[in-house]
């Protein structure tokens, strides 16, 4: 929840990619900071007054951190008054909410645990922090976290939540409890489903007067009982007996960081009845409640799950030519880690898509990992006031250019090499962009199949290639000669749809070249335009020259 807790992470800037300041003159720094400040204030007002949210919790948190970092770069630009919720809450907490220190990794957790005893782990439930006050066995107050000292009076709404205990007995009859109101889920797997904007949804239900029936979706996870029993097991037993079942079910003793890591992975990948964004490790013995204050909870720490996405700044826009001759746009990003991958660029796609997304240098992109760990753009979450977008080069290449190497063809030529060595074409083991660049620099190739004629000695002479690797590489190139004919024409770039491939496996070059447009249209997935492209491809002089050269190399089918 946007509850003022993000400031606890500001001490981590030194280890973050966010520590790099924008290369802006002071006037622009003031302008950009003012705009982002105003937007965050507007989002916060909507969130706290209406329970609405135009952006996800993750994006809000990361842009808030970005604003704080910019302020460090350009001090004195705007008043720093948006780090706490709007000052509408006037209900004072009997015991302050401390917040929780966030640890970056397993090493940090191990260091924090050192010399501590009576440690317990809980999932870091993602919802709305709340104080519940019981007097003489009755729920007399429910207070939103607010700034940790004061919050919104939510008592009337809390009494409408069916899952919330309204009556307590014994030691809980006069107690102060702190916990998380959460949206009850059925088998939520965090790794797959992510955060689902759970915080905003809970806040919305608590702040809308017309949502009484929907409050049945809410439950509570009690994570603190200030001045309660000192023994954690007894504490959880009493909470469970009173109807607060989740904290007892999901609180476990730990003594080693390996156990913490195991629970973290287990809860990240397993079905849970709530959304969570990490784990909390806490000491069983806590200071007296009167000593609690915001930002001073030294007896507990959080280790969050790896983020599903990151907000990253665009550092530059580059254009490259793909194997089809189409201009591709790549955004160079501030380097950040996403899952276990260091991400520093993302493929935007065509010039048309780049223009539609309106991405400029300095903009903030939400980046996640698609299949096989490939970065992708989820959204443009913030655009700078001053737009900086390079002019794309004129298009002068197409699907039939750059089979032969020339200085102006270097990008498309390299793209063709990368394609032909991929699993979708000739599947040359261990060969990719870096190796093709090295080979081309040492032994300039005339055309895209010239590597077939390289000797072992030539490959071994390439910088970075050892004698053993050169021998292995030559062997890989030699094995490729036995690939089926259809793989070779795919490597050349034959524009045939997947559905028609099976009917071409028994063909050879001469049979393909002899086909008319009508014969091509008879194949699955081939229409009039594609048939025309296929005939043009097979009769293009450069393609014909490559086919003749492959025939001289005794490649099957040529």
UniProtKB/Swiss-Prot annotation:
NCBIfam families: PRK08097.1. The active site is at residue 124. GO terms for biological process: DNA repair; DNA replication. This is DNA ligase B. The keyword DNA repair applies. GO terms for molecular function: DNA ligase (NAD+) activity. Pfam families: DNA_ligase_aden, DNA_ligase_OB. Belongs to the NAD-dependent DNA ligase family. LigB subfamily. Its EC number is 6.5.1.2. Catalyzes the formation of phosphodiester linkages between 5'-phosphoryl and 3'-hydroxyl groups in double-stranded DNA using NAD as a coenzyme and as the energy source for the reaction.
